[in-house]
Amino acid sequence: MVQEHTESFWGGIIKSMGLVFGDIGTSPIYTLTVIMTLTKPDAEHVLGILSLIVWTLIILVSVEYAWLAMSLGRKGEGGTIVLKEILVRLLKSGRQVAFVGFLAFMGVSLLLGDGIITPAISILSAVEGMRLIPGWENLAQGVLIFIAAVIALILFIFQFKGTDKVAGAFGPIMVIWFGALTLSGIVSIAGTPEVVSAVSPHHAVTFLMHNGLAGFFILSEVILCATGGEALYADMGHLGRKPIIRAWYFVFSALVINYLGQGAFILRNPNETNILFSMVKSQAPILYIPFLCLTIMATIIASQALISGVFSIVYQGITTRILPLMKVDYTSTHLKSQIYIGSVNWSLLVAVIFIMLIFKKSENLAAAYGLAVTGTMFITGIMMTMIFSHTTKKWKVPIALAVTLIDLVYLTANFHKLPHGGYWSLILASIPLAIMIIWTQGQKALYRALRPLDLDTFLLSFGQIYAKGHNIPGTGLFFVRETAVVPPYVIHCIIRSNIIYERNVFVSLNRSDEPFGVKANLTKGIGPGLDSFEILAGYMELVDIERLLKKKGIEEKVIFYGIEDIATNNPFWRVFSTIKRQTANFVQFNKLPVSKLQGVVTRVEM
């Protein structure tokens, strides 16, 4: 029993390192390299920057995410959409709910934009380490971009197969990576032990006071050390809170030791540029190529974790009706979270390669990086503060508020990146944001334009037609949004066309504000020959409608569903109509048997 507990204890930590800490774990590759291009490599500046890095990791990752955010899970699930679902239940005012909805849209959009920049900067920065291999010093930047693009291409092609089989290796590889970071850090610190004093926050305060506005703008690069911190909370549903927190103790220690080691190396070699790679090469030239291979593997794992995270966010968005339906494939038979969304995968690949070609170097990419991360952190901070103020944990409000204000400071510092490439963060985030706004507003307008009939009025006509006895043998299913209101396509089928079966079943699938759990309720006899089958599922559940129907003894002959043909002169609704046509419909999303499907077109004026 004790052995089993020990295995699960360490197993959880190792898994977390592979699935959660890839992004933040690969930040040492480029963080100090980028910062040192903007400041002097003297003792005061180096110690000040190291102190800022250490305290950024403590405040923004340990306090904001590991402590505050992770205390707000819903059945173990975390993330921006979960915060929104918690808040919507707590708030009374419609305006507040609308504000929270918009915040969630912004948070999700920034995270999706970040999903493009992270693989690009991680893979490109690792590949750039090839220039330190003897004889490869003059490797053209175009060649490095090509190698990085090929790695990205292979990574995205692999998504379709599912990463289930290789995911077991992610944890052990990342354990070796963090071990290598720790070891190289310790060796470097031993040569210049005075860097350890950077742990004291007075160095950070002194740096900011002495450097004024320039010091303030350095914060926009310091935040690079905390990119990926949001994964602690977002991935909570995959692994659970405790393993992630335990793993963070080890990861935090490895990161701090390595950053201090890099600082010590800068003090001894103030003219070096590619700091992590130069440090490792100076310590063990013979191990440099294996370390470079390990770095590339670590960045691939970091990118993989982020791609899986994007799939998960998009799936949450689909089931909570803030994103259009898309074709989803399940790549694992035993892991619920292992999904593949082809349209998202290929869009990400194109965007990642495009960003590599636009920015060319990882240090240029750093200009676009950070804005999305700090924006997400600030939004998380606002939502957490609102939640704590509406619950019994009011004592956490001042702490959450203080952290949110610090997020705002980092976000403000990042605004100066806008002219230098930071605008790409906003462009990338604006695409999903526009889709979400158009989709949610379009769905509401479409629902109003459809003018559904209330059930009681429908039953008057239905009862008369059913009583005539000209009914088709078997069972017909009709998909509706809710049983109480009948959509026009059902009226067209049954009332106008007299397509009526011996048994007719209204089927509705709605999502609860809990992540998991499925309830299926069959109500017989809501009208003569008419039943209602209502499914209420958690927004992370993968629902097998056919299996649920069979469990209740419903063997359908045909499945009817509505298709809206939208006619409009409004450019906003034209975009909505195009999105609706190009994305999956309800029956495609839920993989219902094609041979039984019968789509009924309704023309709608919007």
Curated annotation (Swiss-Prot):
The chain crosses the membrane at residues 18-38, 46-66, 97-117, 140-160, 169-189, 204-224, 247-267, 286-306, 339-359, 368-388, 395-415, 418-438. It catalyses: K(+)(in) + H(+)(in) = K(+)(out) + H(+)(out). Its main location: membrane. It is found in: Cell inner membrane. GO terms for cellular component: plasma membrane. Keywords: Cell inner membrane, Cell membrane, Ion transport, Membrane, Potassium, Potassium transport, Symport, Transmembrane, Transmembrane helix, Transport. InterPro entries: K+_transporter (IPR003855), K_trans_C (IPR053952), K_trans_N (IPR053951), Kup (IPR023051). It is a multi-pass membrane protein. One of its GO terms (molecular function) is symporter activity. Pfam families: K_trans (PF02705), K_trans_C (PF22776). It comes from the Bacteria. HAMAP family: Kup. PANTHER family: K+ POTASSIUM TRANSPORTER (PTHR30540:SF83), OSMOTIC STRESS POTASSIUM TRANSPORTER (PTHR30540). Transport of potassium into the cell. Likely operates as a K(+):H(+) symporter. Belongs to the HAK/KUP transporter (TC 2.A.72) family. This is Probable potassium transport system protein Kup 2. It comes from Geobacter metallireducens (strain ATCC 53774 / DSM 7210 / GS-15).
